[in-house]
Amino acid sequence: MLYNFYLGNVTEKDLFDNIGLKTRVQETKSIIKKYTHMHEKLIVNQMREIVEYFYDNYGCRIFNLSQGDLNYPYNDKKPRAWTCVLDELQREYDILFIVSSGNYDYTYEHDVKNILADYPKYFFTDEKARVIDPAASSISLTVGGMALSSIPFVASDERISALPISQKNQISSSTRIGPGIQKAIKPEFVAYGGDNVFNTMLSKISPNVGNYVISLSNKLTDGLFCQDVGTSFAAPYVSHIAALVLERYPHISNNLLRAILASASSVPKEIELQIEKLDDTEEFINCLQPSFKQNVKGQMRANKKKMLHYLVGYGYPIQDMATDSFEQRVMLLADMKDENAIQVDKNHIFEIPIPKEFEAAKGKKRITVSLAYNPDVRKTRMDYLGKSMSFDLIRGKSLEEVYQVCASQAGLDEEEKKERFESKYICDIGNCGKTLREYGTLQKGTFEFSRSSYGENYYLVVDCKKNWSVEKQNYALVVTYQVEDKSVKIYELLKNRIRVPRGRERV
């Protein structure tokens, strides 16, 4: 956010020295409202030319795409060409597209007078509120919007007629939601995109600068900055965090960059509360899209876990969490590519050290695992992704036991596999749940515990399943330790523990 006002020209030096921008990593944001001669070239070719130009000439690896086609909300069918080319380019160039989810207009399908009562339920009942092309892209990061303020701007002599639709840190009334391709979590993140208000005098949705965000203008003749509302203004925040991470770790892959951002994100409490408060009325259940229904003992109920994660994904990325470790919060990174990539229908096993001091610390302890991979894709197949990956965190077993079980089941179909271990030995990784998590190429789960007596090592088992591609698969892992006990210096404990690698790395 920009809080300084300038007169005259703003130079690059002003931006870095006075506004506090922290990175000069090359990233590209499209600020032209319409491409020059856009109708003379297919959008697929335009995307490829843009990437080739900025990658070849500037080494640009982060592309912010605050554009989309409102005519094509994702409808669970085969993805369109614009979506596919983003996935292909990211795998080919090891770059990252960060895409806005698109803006939803409630008035197209509903009576505007009902918006205050209908918000946020309409996201889950209206299929046209889904993310638009190309925001369903499997490898891109998609960003939805949340409200910046609860207080509309009102002039001193103006009658108060503007009512906020959303409160601060709640989901924006004009964002769009998932699911994405093959039920994947979309959007993955949310950021401040502002919101409009409901004007009680005019009975219409109106703009209000009190809840707008400031960004670069896409009208070059009107100055450098502008203020407006929409997910187009939320996506650049995530792009900026990605650039800071890339400046800190300049040689990391697209996969590790995405995994770090996921590990640094959390769902705002205000949005969690919004979902919790939704009533399971029969009328609401009947209107829900199929994705958000579940059968509970013969009764149809709202699946609030899916509602939350298809609304906000993994939440709001926090800058410091993405770029640094702390005494009570530490990230371990693994960028598994090239010769370290995983073969299809095989496993990799990682030893996760559990220091005694961490296990015995007061309060809650958390181990968060984030996995990202960039499979080859094919628009013409029912299985869009060439491979699927997943992970489990095992405790209370030796490395040899884990190795033997995983080796015996490598390459088997899911229905042929037996349960690896009793449930008590498999960490209950929360958040969205295993099934929902595994639909996407960016996965995150947290194991939270207060007491444990399962030994000094856990084992992270990573699986790669062939859908139709036989190529080895690059991927990345981030394992984050977090402890509430301020007396436990987990950073130093882990730093000393992992200097010498131990155990088998893969099966």
Could you say what each language-model-derived stretch is?
Residues 285-393:
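Secreted peptidase-domain scaffold signal
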Residues 1-18, 226-246:
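Active-site alpha-helical elements of protease catalytic centers
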Residues 430-453:
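Beta-sandwich interaction modules
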Residues 1-75, 261:
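Subtilisin-like peptidase catalytic core
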Residues 131, 384-413, 418, 422-425, ...:
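C-terminal edge strands of extracellular/lumenal beta-sandwich accessory domains
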Residues 64-66, 97-102, 143:
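Active-site neighborhood of phospho(di)ester-bond hydrolases with catalytic His/Asp-centered motifs
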Residues 249-275:
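An often Trp-containing, charged/polar helix-loop segment at the C-terminal end
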Residues 146-235:
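Catalytic-core environment of secreted peptidases
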